[in-house]
Swiss-Prot record:
This is Small ribosomal subunit protein uS4c. SUPFAM superfamilies: Alpha-L RNA-binding motif. One of its GO terms (molecular function) is rRNA binding. Part of the 30S ribosomal subunit. Contacts protein S5. The interaction surface between S4 and S5 is involved in control of translational fidelity. Its main location: plastid. The gene is rps4. Residues 82-143 form the S4 RNA-binding domain. Belongs to the universal ribosomal protein uS4 family. One of the primary rRNA binding proteins, it binds directly to 16S rRNA where it nucleates assembly of the body of the 30S subunit. With S5 and S12 plays an important role in translational accuracy. GO terms for cellular component: chloroplast; small ribosomal subunit. The keyword Transcription does not apply. Keywords: Chloroplast, Plastid, Ribonucleoprotein, Ribosomal protein, RNA-binding, rRNA-binding.
Length: 194
């Protein structure tokens, strides 16, 4: 993880740690001019590691975004932001996206009253995300909510910290995406691969 954040910069979905500027001697040796391919590859890797996706999963999302109406890059980011594991992370119910994925796969999370154990589930507007009634599930979420930094919640989500309930209000607006990334470079990377 730390090699990744040193190379690619801050990845809040992967870890809360931040790279120290100028501390990596390898990057100082490689400080020559970056090729266009390397710039596109780094943007793609940033996106992949932030959301915790395999290469195959990301390629699938790029194909879905390419077929949809609108800007492929914006649609891609919307698809990734509306994943259940990412929504849990953005609500503050988990400290990282891998932590949120573990909560989902261990069956602690309900979507609209049903147990959901698929982290890639695409949340829709008016979805209600809650925890199981079991004490262990509530304790896990309570610890995450208490320890998470109180950042401003994106306007497409609302949370009730007393009942451990989150609500998806609408599809995310592009200005609320929590990662500094040029999504067009990711789309370019894949368009040149095929």
């Amino acid at each position: 993880r730390f090699k990744k954040i040193r190379r690619l910069g801050a990845l809040p979905g992967l870890t809360s740690k931040r790279p120290r500027s100028g501390s990596d001697p390898k990057n100082q040796l490689r400080s020559g001019k970056k090729s266009q391919y390397r710039i596109r590859l780094e943007e793609k890797q940033k996106l992949r590691f932030h959301y915790g996706l395999t290469e195959r999963q990301l390629l699938k999302y790029v194909h879905i975004a390419g077929k949809a109406k609108g800007s492929t890059g914006q649609v891609l980011l919307q698809l990734l932001e509306m994943r259940l594991d990412n929504i849990l992370f953005r609500l503050g119910m988990a400290s990282t996206i891998p932590g949120a994925r573990q909560l989902v796969t261990h069956r602690h999370i309900l979507v609209n009253g049903r147990i959901m154990d698929i982290p890639s589930y695409r949340c829709k507007p008016r979805d209600i995300i809650t925890t199981k009634d079991k004490q262990r599930s509530k304790a896990l979420i309570q610890n995450y909510i208490a320890s998470s930094p109180q950042e401003e919640l994106p306007n497409h989500l609302t949370i009730d910290p007393i009942q451990y309930k989150g609500l998806v209000n609408q599809i995310i607006d592009s200005k609320w995406i929590g990662l500094k990334i040029n999504e067009l470079l990711v789309v370019e990377y894949y368009s040149r691969q095929t």
